A protein has these predicted regions:
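A compositional signature for long Ser/Thr(±Pro)-rich, low-complexity
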Residues: 1-439
């Protein structure tokens, strides 16, 4: 139905579907939706477990809302305001100027501080301060008030109504559709054939996998369980693991640090690391550089552009690089993300030309929780889903592992959360270690 209750004759809605059972086991899997463009949608599920299964459908965004999001994403400006400080040693206070990953075309080039690095496909510009030099750059933060004012002008009042909680089906409906599935649950096999070992360039499948009593079963590769400290240590023995990206990468870093009871060196937004001297395991996390969506001032020296970081890493068979780039890019023009990915792609190719046995692992986006217009404008799941496909398009043919956690997130038993709870992260780590240490 459209906004007036009439049957739709066009597609474009952003829909999620799930097949699940609650008894005697708790199991679930995400469906894949085909949009026929005429108001008709078909959800397909890979039947992986037997029982009385129920179907749930969730309208995340109507097609009208998607058009608004698409218009904003394809624009030339970010959907947040970032200001950066410039301060000479003799000045008591910094000058705060607007900065962005895209140039402000209304400014003369003489009025711009250009911090771009074309060698790694990075662009970053600031309005030149009146009394400070460009080299006096001290840090940046999100201007929340200016960002909200910008959001208010980005859509009409009618368009904003498309994102109210009573417009979309935030509850999964209907709950009275069920099917009886018979047969036996198979592990590591699909249609009688063994799944490949976890690693790069895995073939596409009808489903990423399914939840079964709290454990994720992959249908893409032979993922194992690493539920003891001993099994994790055995996998990571003598390895140096670099975590590069956003807070969802840091969540993996922290999980492993706590699991192995390692002391964290460094704090806050600074680079942090942990070392297990006995087992020769090293973890190192560094947040990616701009764009960043953060209120407190961020020191640029505490961050690094991922491509630049890759160029500075000495690879080898005992080196693992884990990358996640999405949460802070959803509010950027789509070309900013594409450009950044190409820079990272070239850096990975340079790394593998030096050390072809270096493992590179990319973690995809997952779903998040939104309930205000500003959240949708900056961080809608529709944006995250587009970034997922761009990652596969630009990086999919490289010798890297892409761990797709989207369907894990869609079908989990928890509410949507950019930072899923620990029992979900535990299953993420199983996948990660299965790619580092395949059978």
């Amino acid at each position: 139905m459209d906004s007036r209750g009439r049957p739709k004759s066009y597609g474009g809605d952003f829909i999620r579907t799930k097949l699940f059972s609650k008894s005697p086991v708790q199991a679930s899997t995400a469906g894949r939706v085909t949009d026929y463009g005429n108001g008709t949608y078909v959800a397909r599920f890979f039947l992986s477990f037997p029982g009385r299964l129920h179907v749930a459908v969730k309208l995340v965004h109507s097609s009208e809302a998607v058009q608004v999001l698409k218009r904003l994403q394809e624009g030339s400006l970010a959907r947040r305001v970032m200001v950066c400080g410039f301060q000479e040693e003799t000045d008591p206070n910094p000058e705060w100027m607007q900065c962005s990953n895209t140039p402000n075309k209304s400014l003369n080039l003489r009025d711009v501080c250009d911090f771009s690095n074309p060698l790694i496909n990075v662009s970053f510009y600031c309005q030149r301060p009146e009394s400070s030099r460009c080299v006096s750059f001290v840090g940046c933060h999100r201007d929340h008030a200016a960002t909200l004012a910008m959001h208010d002008k980005m859509a009409t009042e009618e368009e904003k109504k498309l994102f109210t909680r009573d417009r979309d089906l935030h509850e999964e409906l209907p709950r009275d559709i069920s099917v009886q599935v018979k047969g036996k649950r198979r592990v590591w096999k699909v249609h009688g054939k063994a799944l490949p070992l976890c690693g790069p360039r895995l073939p596409e499948t009808a489903s990423e996998g399914y939840w079964f009593n709290g454990a994720w079963t992959s249908l893409r590769c032979q993922a194992r369980r690493f539920r003891t400290v001993e099994s994790v240590v055995e996998c990571l023995h003598n390895k140096t693991v670099f975590f590069r990206g956003d807070s969802t990468t840091r969540q993996w870093f922290r999980y492993l640090m706590i699991l192995l009871k390692l002391q964290q060196h460094g704090r806050g937004a600074q680079p942090v690391f942990g070392i297990d001297e006995k087992n020769k395991i090293k973890f190192h996390f560094l947040f990616h550089k701009f764009p960043r969506n953060q209120g407190p001032v961020m020191d640029g020296n505490d961050m690094g552009y991922v491509a630049e970081e890759i160029d500075g890493i000495s690879g080898g068979k005992d080196v693992v690089i884990i990358i996640t780039l999405w949460a802070h890019f959803m509010a950027e023009p789509i070309q900013t993300f594409r450009s950044r990915l190409y820079g990272i792609r070239h850096a990975i190719e340079r790394l593998h030309s030096r050390h072809p046995d270096t493992k590179v692992i990319w973690r995809t986006p997952n779903t998040g929780h939104h309930h205000q217009f500003q959240h949708y404008v900056e961080n809608s799941d529709w944006y995250a889903y587009q970034l997922l496909h761009i990652v596969k398009e630009i990086l999919g043919d490289l010798n890297i592992s892409i761990i797709n956690v989207w369907e894990m997130s869609e079908s989990m038993w928890h509410d949507d959360d950019m930072h899923p709870p620990n029992d979900v992260i535990e299953n993420h780590i199983d996948l990660l270690l299965s790619h580092i240490c395949p059978l």
